[in-house]
């Protein structure tokens, strides 16, 4: 099965040892536009296995970008590059963001990646896209600019030792801008005032479509970190009810995939089933469902949940939208890999 992975035929998704360089070469270098679930796994293994060789990571991921047209893979490459948070990766992301012919999901992720890397030089890059014709890119760049300005606010001092400044800022990024609980660089930097807000106030901000998007994002991540029934239900509700911003709903889906709370199941399935929803939201929902279904919980209740997730992902692995269909295959691969099982998709 090549190209669009949701055409006819069947495939068996099953465990394959991926923690080696041969797997990475097989699926990111030798394979083009097929076996998307293995390509995605190879992408994350590449980041880990070559973590001490950034030049090789750049070579492999650049090759993958140049030789694959899957929006899902290209988008995820941009995400991984941003999370690596190395200034050597700036040029790759700038090229993606500059390309107005590139899919907006990829451009969105490139802008987020530039903010995650945090270089002060990225501020002027991001400013150029604040009036982009794509609302998803505009909104992402607004958030990215806010994040970059916060991360670099100490870089404007007149100290003569610029290298020392850069090292201090880099350490601050590592210490303050990475989620300790989820080990990710979030797309917004929290303000201290947000720490004192009550749950009700955060939920109000989350649902208020009239406030700046950054404020809603701050509420989103604060509620994620609480990991309570109330906070997860609030996130699930806004995933379904929000009408203002696709990138916001996509981030809600991503966060629910991090939280791995069973209360999110009905909201995620409802969102995936909504074929009128933006593809970037449904794609993220499919991945979140895969994560939720890959837990090793030995209870009948969870087995029922897992069965429903597998059935749903199988159904939408044939979705008319390629990025959604591929994301469902990747979600199924999460389950197959983590639980060492085989899943047949007809």
From Swiss-Prot:
Cofactor(s) essential for the protein: Fe(2+)
Enzyme class: oxidoreductase
EC code(s) of this entry: 1.14.99.29
Record: residues binding Fe cation 1: 75, 283-284
Gene3D superfamilies for this protein: Leucine-rich Repeat Variant
InterPro entries: ARM-like, ARM-type_fold, Deoxyhypusine_hydroxylase, PBS_lyase_HEAT
GO molecular function, one term: deoxyhypusine monooxygenase activity
Pfam families reported in the protein's UniProt record: HEAT_2
Ligand binding (Fe cation 2): 108-109, 250
HEAT-like PBS-type repeats, residue ranges: 71-100, 104-133, 213-242, 246-275, 279-320
SMART domains in UniProt: EZ_HEAT
Its job: Catalyzes the hydroxylation of the N(6)-(4-aminobutyl)-L-lysine intermediate produced by deoxyhypusine synthase/DHPS on a critical lysine of the eukaryotic translation initiation factor 5A/eIF-5A. This is the second step of the post-translational modification of that lysine into an unusual amino acid residue named hypusine. Hypusination is unique to mature eIF-5A factor and is essential for its function.
UniProt-recorded name of the protein: Deoxyhypusine hydroxylase
Species the sequence originates in: Plasmodium vivax (strain Salvador I)
Encoding gene per record: dohh
């Amino acid at each position: 099965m090549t190209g669009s992975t949701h055409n006819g035929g069947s495939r068996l998704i099953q465990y394959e040892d991926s923690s080696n360089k041969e797997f990475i070469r097989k699926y990111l270098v030798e394979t083009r536009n097929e076996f998307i679930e293995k390509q995605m796994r190879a992408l994350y293994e590449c980041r880990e296995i070559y973590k001490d060789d950034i030049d090789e990571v750049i070579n492999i991921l650049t090759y993958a970008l140049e030789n694959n047209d899957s929006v899902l893979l290209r988008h995820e490459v941009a995400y991984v590059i941003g999370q690596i948070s190395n200034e050597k990766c700036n040029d790759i992301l700038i090229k993606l963001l500059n390309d107005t012919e590139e899919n907006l999901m990829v451009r969105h992720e490139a802008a987020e990646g530039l903010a995650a890397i945090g270089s002060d030089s990225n501020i002027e890059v991001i400013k150029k896209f604040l009036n982009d014709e794509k609302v998803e890119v505009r909104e992402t760049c607004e958030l990215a600019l806010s994040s970059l300005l916060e991360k670099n606010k100490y870089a404007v001092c007149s100290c003569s030792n610029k290298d020392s400044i850069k090292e201090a800022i880099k350490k601050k990024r590592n210490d303050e801008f990475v989620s300790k609980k989820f080990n990710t660089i979030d797309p917004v930097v929290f303000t201290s005032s947000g720490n004192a807000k009550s749950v009700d106030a955060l939920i109000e901000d989350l649902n208020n479509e009239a406030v700046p998007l950054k404020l809603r994002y701050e509420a989103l991540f604060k509620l994620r970190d609480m990991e309570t029934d109330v906070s997860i239900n609030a996130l699930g509700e806004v995933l379904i009810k929000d009408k203002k911003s696709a990138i916001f709903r996509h981030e809600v889906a991503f966060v629910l995939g991090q939280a791995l709370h069973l209360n999110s199941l009905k909201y995620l399935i409802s969102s995936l089933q909504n074929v009128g929803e933006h593809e970037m939201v449904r794609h993220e929902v499919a991945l979140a469902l895969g994560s939720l279904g890959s837990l090793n919980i030995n209870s009948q209740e969870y087995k029922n949940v897992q069965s429903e997730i597998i059935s749903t992902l199988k159904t939408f692995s044939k979705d008319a939208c390629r990025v959604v269909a591929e994301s469902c295959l990747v979600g199924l691969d999460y389950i197959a890999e983590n639980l060492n099982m085989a899943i047949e998709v007809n």
